[in-house]
Swiss-Prot record:
Component of the PI(3,5)P2 regulatory complex. This is Vacuolar segregation protein 7. The lineage of its organism: Eukaryota, Fungi, Dikarya, Ascomycota, Taphrinomycotina. It holds the Pfam family Vac7. It comes from Schizosaccharomyces pombe (strain 972 / ATCC 24843). Keywords: Endoplasmic reticulum, Glycoprotein, Golgi apparatus, Membrane, Signal-anchor, Transmembrane, Transmembrane helix, Vacuole.
């Protein structure tokens, strides 16, 4: 191998005469120098990212916020840490919460048969107060959502028995939204409807009875007035007859 040739550098010099301070004008010292007092700042405008008005889920919102934070200030690590620390759940309870990246029913766009089933909350099970001898309502009974069902924010149950996959996705029904009469037999529904209408029937009967009493009282009063007027007419007729036959001949 051939050895590399050494580099040759040439330096050009030029002699300059010394300039005395007398030749320099005095006005140079009086000029205000702004460049020496203030340093230039690299002013970078933050990019504004237009987010869509409608977000399908919290996961999309999280991704949009992270992307906007990274695009706005790529060199600032504190802003990225702030976004991640505030949005990532730390506890196990928060991981199973309904608000952790839930997709609504509209984003799935699945038919009714493909949707996941909704289990009953165990408050209406065999040990609950609404179960009839442990029969009609149990934990194994399931409900199928309607086609017009939309996503609504539901508060997760604090009971540890409800930690099923459906409750983790926020699809479990809360005990306040369950109507126990809808899943019962038609005969039981008829009995319940009849019992619920009994107060109205009793009030109607009491009103009819009060009306009958008032009509009876009015009839009795009318009969009394008729009898009084009849006796008064008889008295007037008898007095006229007595005056005509007994008193008039004497005059």
């Amino acid at each position: 191998m051939s050895e590399p040739k050494p580099m040759q550098m040439s330096v050009e010099t030029e002699t300059v005469l010394n300039v005395s301070q007398v030749q320099i004008p005095s006005s140079c010292d009086r000029k205000a120098s702004l460049e020496t007092l203030k340093t230039k700042k690299n002013a970078q405008k933050k990019k504004k990212i237009s987010l869509p008005n409608v977000m399908t889920s919290k996961a999309a919102m999280f991704a949009a916020r992270v992307a906007s934070a990274v695009d706005q200030d790529p060199n600032d690590e504190e802003s990225e840490n702030f976004v991640y620390e505030n949005l990532i759940p730390t506890n196990d309870d928060e991981l199973h919460s309904p608000s952790a990246s839930i997709h609504s029913f509209q984003t799935y766009n699945l038919p009714l048969e493909m949707l996941p089933t909704i289990n009953h909350v165990p408050y209406y099970g065999s040990a609950g107060t609404n179960a009839l001898n442990g029969g009609p309502l149990s934990n194994s009974r399931k409900l199928i959502p309607k086609r017009s069902a939309k996503f609504s924010s539901m508060v997760g149950s604090s009971d540890t028995r409800c930690n099923s996959p459906t409750t983790a996705r926020g699809l479990a029904t809360s005990p306040l939204q369950i109507n126990p009469t809808t899943s019962k037999s038609p005969l039981l529904n008829k009995k319940l409807s009849s019992t619920s209408q009994e107060p109205f029937r009793t009030s109607r009967r009491s009103g009819q009875e009060s009306g009958d009493v008032t009509t009876k009282m009015l009839r009795n009063l009318l009969h009394k007035r008729l009898w009084i007027s009849f006796f008064f007419a008889c008295f007037v007729v008898l007095s006229l007859v007595y005056f005509h036959y007994a008193v008039q001949p004497l005059l």
